[in-house]
């Protein structure tokens, strides 16, 4: 109809996830551009659900949304395989991967991706340090007690199960809980003071690029 937009621009993970969760004709047919979103994402459930126990399936923007009219986008990709390869290169005796994620959409989205990718590595045990069900202090204590031959893969940590935003030096405090643990990062969190390294997306401002693509699309 005359009130249908010519284009929808979606910035950020939450906006993108909310949009692709709309199973409607207008959402699927309206041209859309996304920015500051990852290749992996989640489709939100229809009804209210206890997110502490929700086990969502990781979806891929390239392969799972062919029925949506996505005309352009600037996305970043978390590469679990390259990080496992890097960890094994440094620590060939690694037997376990402890993954840290928080009580946010981004944290759960990363956790769903890592769960999917870790199915390729049946020889590795995965330990979930999950801010949906654990407080910062509980995660810190579990870090202290992690067994030998464990490497940590750091996702994100901003909000724990109390829904309190944690302060900026939280990663320093987690580091100090077990300073000898080898830690790698999938999202650049902890680089420079805790994580040894990691394959992370190349985050960058996309406003000008999206503006140019939008202008070109509407000017056709």
Where are the regions that the model predicts?
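Short hydrophobic alpha-helices and adjacent helix-cap/hinge residues
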Residues: 1-220
């Amino acid at each position: 109809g005359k009130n249908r937009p010519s284009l929808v621009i979606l910035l950020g993970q939450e906006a993108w996830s909310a949009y692709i969760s709309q199973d409607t004709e207008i959402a699927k047919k309206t041209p859309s551009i996304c920015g500051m979103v990852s290749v992996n994402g989640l489709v939100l459930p229809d009804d209210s659900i206890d997110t502490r126990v929700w086990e969502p399936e990781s979806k891929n923007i390239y392969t799972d949304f062919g029925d949506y009219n996505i005309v352009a986008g600037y996305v970043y990709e978390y590469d679990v395989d390259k990080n496992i390869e890097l960890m094994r290169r440094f620590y060939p005796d690694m037997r376990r991967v402890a993954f840290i994620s928080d009580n946010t959409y981004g944290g759960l989205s990363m956790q769903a991706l890592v769960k999917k990718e870790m199915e390729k590595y049946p020889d590795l045990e995965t330990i979930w340090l999950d801010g949906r069900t654990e407080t910062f202090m509980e995660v810190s204590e579990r870090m202290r007690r992690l067994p030998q031959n464990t490497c940590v893969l750091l996702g994100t940590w901003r909000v724990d199960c109390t829904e309190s935003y944690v302060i900026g030096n939280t990663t320093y405090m987690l580091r100090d809980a077990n300073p000898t643990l080898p830690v790698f990062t999938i999202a650049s969190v902890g680089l420079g003071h805790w994580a040894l390294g990691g394959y992370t997306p190349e985050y960058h401002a996309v406003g000008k690029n999206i503006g140019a693509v939008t202008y070109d699309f509407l000017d056709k």
